[in-house]
Amino acid sequence: MVMADGPRHLQRGPVRVGFYDIEGTLGKGNFAVVKLGRHRITKTEVAIKIIDKSQLDAVNLEKIYREVQIMKMLDHPHIIKLYQVMETKSMLYLVTEYAKNGEIFDYLANHGRLNESEARRKFWQILSAVDYCHGRKIVHRDLKAENLLLDNNMNIKIADFGFGNFFKSGELLATWCGSPPYAAPEVFEGQQYEGPQLDIWSMGVVLYVLVCGALPFDGPTLPILRQRVLEGRFRIPYFMSEDCEHLIRRMLVLDPSKRLTIAQIKEHKWMLIEVPVQRPVLYPQEQENEPSIGEFNEQVLRLMHSLGIDQQKTIESLQNKSYNHFAAIYFLLVERLKSHRSSFPVEQRLDGRQRRPSTIAEQTVAKAQTVGLPVTMHSPNMRLLRSALLPQASNVEAFSFPASGCQAEAAFMEEECVDTPKVNGCLLDPVPPVLVRKGCQSLPSNMMETSIDEGLETEGEAEEDPAHAFEAFQSTRSGQRRHTLSEVTNQLVVMPGAGKIFSMNDSPSLDSVDSEYDMGSVQRDLNFLEDNPSLKDIMLANQPSPRMTSPFISLRPTNPAMQALSSQKREVHNRSPVSFREGRRASDTSLTQGIVAFRQHLQNLARTKGILELNKVQLLYEQIGPEADPNLAPAAPQLQDLASSCPQEEVSQQQESVSTLPASVHPQLSPRQSLETQYLQHRLQKPSLLSKAQNTCQLYCKEPPRSLEQQLQEHRLQQKRLFLQKQSQLQAYFNQMQIAESSYPQPSQQLPLPRQETPPPSQQAPPFSLTQPLSPVLEPSSEQMQYSPFLSQYQEMQLQPLPSTSGPRAAPPLPTQLQQQQPPPPPPPPPPRQPGAAPAPLQFSYQTCELPSAASPAPDYPTPCQYPVDGAQQSDLTGPDCPRSPGLQEAPSSYDPLALSELPGLFDCEMLDAVDPQHNGYVLVN
């Protein structure tokens, strides 16, 4: 439900609930609505859940009170904090912590999946919060992406304990609750279950969602979803590491007793890659005994006393866990003092510039915390109390709404009397934090000179040149995750000469601001990082408002291997093909309507873009390697310049690139490298482009998907290039061995295999060509086939039966050594044969498309000396045991007849495309 905007003169001021001004609507349900409020004393934003008790039955009302009871027991940095409970006759108001950046569901929908390092940090926070709950015998039972919120610093906050319950070790629960995609199989089967094991399953689904951006179990209907959950089968995408896969599989085990426990998850190999630093919790933990007065924050108690709030009543409220106005103001003031420190991302390694070089600052901070007052929490002698803001006799405040409103919201708009104590003053609005702090910078008078050790110190030069800083920002932005600005702003900051516009937030509204917050923390509303600011402070804009100095963004140096990917194009690469937001939310239970949540088809996701981060790193380091060490051989010869459109240039360039490697050495490829990667390598104009981020991102991330037909054509083109290359190399080898066009070797001669590099071909093709239509099996060739000229007069030759006797001068078959070691280029078109002519005395046979006329096993060929040649050639070709014949002798009549029983074996033969190196021919190898 949305609050209606009536005319300004009809409104009596902002809508108020107790000390809270209602500023908007965050969410709504059947019996409750969540409003965004701001405390009028502390100026802190809160989320107020307004529940209409008159619409609830006894069972649901009991669940509401149980949720309140559970939230009162929980006090953890990664669990939404309960500040106050207000109850009237028909309404219940739950004031809780406000997570400014919303659900991680929406974050994944807008930004795509997280990388495993980010997912690990998020999952550690979830794990610590769930472990905290289980330690207090509380089970959540509804862990899902919609209930994982992100605060101002992109840290996890678990919300919505509406399905939470208490459990005892060994006792089973039976309530069917939760969201179907996250529900464990024992819930679908209607069995009793142990609460912690149920949360372990849900956390496994959550981890899968963080890493993959999709649900492991999903279906168009509830029965199909149930079937998939009970089978326990889910897809693992190509980008998931083996350790992460192992952890998820051990959590998503059908048998609850075999699932990992929280202690085992903490010790898992994937979790131990990066262990977060433990920090103290925000508030002191209540033990079995009641906390003493000394355990409360004296600074906050004194401040409340200066505001006219009874200190004794505040202490009693805290000890009794009343969660009234006194406790709420105390919690909010403590939050405003310390929340930014507890919400700071903690890293194990602190950079030297991030850490102050002296302990004097820490001692000053400790002294200021025990003696002084915060900056924006002013004492009366600073003349900053504004007691006139609140009525002096504001014992009762009316819950009033505008006169114009919709009927659906009428139940939440009735005026309720919420008693509020008398307060003589309030705090000023939070001041935007100063994001730049130099060593000797003079600060405004309302800011303390002391700062916490998280303060950043800039490098000086970067502050003066925005264009140079923006260039550095662009170069280092590539390795960082995408973050949204937490608030939509109106002011645009244009970088000089950069051509890009950045939107900056100058709203003075902040969750928590104090003296430490003002002194240079980067935490404001620019959540570009979840890590500690370190190493490089980069200017984003000049002063956008009088109250804000030049904001800096602190970025870590990027991985050099990933520098080729800018953040925007990494976002496109990380984002799944279908939007994560498309479809229903997991909380919607209308599964029978055929709507699919998270339409992430992982079977397609695993086959899209066979380009992995490994390939990019390998290609990049192959390019960087020769530049770093000139003695090394070129690492990627296949990346030579193939931009020329002429086929001859392509062939010659490919020969040059291949000749840089030995004959038996091939470029190392990734096991997962696909045809598309090879295609992109040929598309690459200059290998040096790999080191430039903006040019190579298009190569890897913007390549449109291609059909199977296009991939087949590219594959054929690659085969054609290989064939042309091998053909030219063989021709050069023939020339080297002094094999003339009309010459013919001796019958017993066997050619040695080429073992050395072959020079480029220098001999022109013979003037004879073969023009015959190709069969569909054969690959087309850009060049016409070359063959020896003595076959030109026997083009129409048919295979005739041979006599059974074979002379001693029968030609031997093709050596098996040649058949095995020749690469398989596409077969050439066969030469036609003339009917009635004698068969050629060849050491090979051309394979036609008619399989029955293929070469029979071990045919007997006549001697090559039957053909008339001139005297010079004849003297060179014939051996001592081969007599010269003056003319064409009579050839044997025919081959042996081929029986029909031998045909099946002939049809089963496999074309291995073995090459006859003497005549560029091909034979069948069975």
UniProtKB/Swiss-Prot annotation:
Residues with PTM Phosphothreonine: T25, T175, T484
Annotated Low complexity bias: 644-659, 742-756
EC number(s) given by UniProt: 2.7.11.1
Keywords annotated in UniProt: Acetylation, ATP-binding, Cytoplasm, Endoplasmic reticulum, Kinase, Magnesium, Membrane, Metal-binding, Nucleotide-binding, Phosphoprotein, Serine/threonine-protein kinase, Transferase
Reaction(s) this enzyme catalyzes, per UniProt: L-seryl-[protein] + ATP = O-phospho-L-seryl-[protein] + ADP + H(+); L-threonyl-[protein] + ATP = O-phospho-L-threonyl-[protein] + ADP + H(+)
Bias type Pro residues, positions: 822-834
Post-translational modification: Phosphorylated at Thr-175 by STK11/LKB1 in complex with STE20-related adapter-alpha (STRADA) pseudo kinase and CAB39. Phosphorylated at Thr-484 in response to insulin in adipocytes. Acetylation at Lys-53 inhibits kinase activity. Deacetylated by HDAC6.
Binding positions for ATP per the UniProt entry: L26, G27, K28, G29, N30, F31, A32, V33, V34, K49
Domain of life, per lineage: Eukaryota
Active site (catalytic residues): D142
PROSITE patterns per the UniProt record, alphabetical: PROTEIN_KINASE_ATP, PROTEIN_KINASE_DOM, PROTEIN_KINASE_ST, UBA
Cofactor: Mg(2+)
Residue positions where N6-acetyllysine is found in the record: K53
Documented effect of changing T175A: Prevents phosphorylation and activation by STK11/LKB1 complex
Stated family: Belongs to the protein kinase superfamily. CAMK Ser/Thr protein kinase family. SNF1 subfamily.
Assembly description: Interacts with and phosphorylates TORC2/CRTC2.
Function: Serine/threonine-protein kinase that plays a role in many biological processes such as fatty acid oxidation, autophagy, immune response or glucose metabolism. Phosphorylates 'Ser-794' of IRS1 in insulin-stimulated adipocytes, potentially modulating the efficiency of insulin signal transduction. Inhibits CREB activity by phosphorylating and repressing TORCs, the CREB-specific coactivators. Phosphorylates EP300 and thus inhibits its histone acetyltransferase activity. In turn, regulates the DNA-binding ability of several transcription factors such as PPARA or MLXIPL.
Name of the protein in question: Serine/threonine-protein kinase SIK2
Gene assigned in the entry: SIK2
